[in-house]
Design a protein with these regions (language model features):
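Pre-Walker A adenine-sensing motif
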Residues: 67
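Class I SAM-binding transferase module
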Residues: 1-57, 63, 72-83, 88, ...
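Aromatic pocket-lining residues of Rossmann-like dinucleotide-binding sites
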Residues: 99
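Conserved SAM/SAH-binding loop
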Residues: 92
Length: 242
């Protein structure tokens, strides 16, 4: 029996750990979650921490910011030109850190404004500004739609991550419309655009979970018309991406 257990332990240790996305999403497979509403609610620190573990997103943001910096500042302007980069909805600062890394990698000078309405996240930003960022970053405690910087602080690059899970569920256009006023003519918005895709699939597990969600104050079918955030694992897709 001892050898049998040792063999099972050996097999378990040989199980592939999965790619970074699989590791990040472990424990959330086929689990119904309500979409977040960060404009209406102030997110908790634990929620930000989950976001910041995304293994792909911030790396891609860093690449995009670096490309924008190199496009706006030519080699002969390295010592003369300093760009203003504004992060709207800065959270606890992952995009600020990505911007500073991109600045260092591209050798382009930037001044960063981190605009955040959540007072809890602002405290974290201010602490990082005090301990690490110094004069490179200015923390602004304000709703991006209400902030009115002086014209000399208008953005050459405007960065946001209000992408949401699907469509406009985090009110990205509504928020960014108010922030467009401090983007310079010819400035760059990251992301420039994004697209949501929809396709049919079948999942017996999720169907039964939704069916078991009962609320006496709602119509019996209301839960079937409610949006959920799900990391799919056991399902059958009827239309594959081309």
């Amino acid at each position: 029996m001892k050898f049998y257990q040792q063999y099972l332990d050996h097999l378990y240790q040989q199980v592939p750990v999965g790619d970074p996305l699989q590791q990040f999403a472990r424990g959330y497979e086929d689990y119904l979650q309500c979409p977040l509403q960060p404009l209406m609610d102030n997110l908790e620190s634990q929620t930000y921490e989950v976001f910041e573990k995304d293994p792909v997103k911030y790396s891609e943001y860093e690449k995009a910011i670096k490309a924008a910096l190199m496009d706006l500042v030519k080699e002969e302007e390295l010592d003369k030109k300093e760009l203003v980069l504004i992060v709207v909805g800065a959270g606890r600062g992952p995009l600020v850190r990505a911007a500073l890394r991109a600045s260092e990698a591209s050798r382009r000078k930037i001044r960063v404004f981190a605009v955040e309405k959540n007072p809890n996240a602002v405290i974290t930003l201010q602490q990082q500004q005090l301990e690490m960022w110094g004069d490179l970053v200015t923390v602004v405690s304000s709703d991006m739609r209400d902030w009115n910087p002086p014209e000399e602080d208008y953005a050459d690059i405007l960065v946001s991550e209000l992408l949401g899970s699907f469509g406009d569920n985090e009110l990205s256009p509504e928020c960014l419309d108010g922030a467009q006023k401090f983007l310079k003519p010819g400035g760059i918005s990251i992301p420039y655009s994004y697209t949501s895709y929809i396709g049919p699939l079948q999942s017996s597990k999720l169907y039964n979970e939704v069916r078991n969600c009962k609320d006496e104050t709602k119509h019996p079918l209301a839960n079937f018309e409610t949006p959920y955030v799900v990391h799919f694992q056991v399902n059958e897709k009827f239309l594959h991406h081309r």
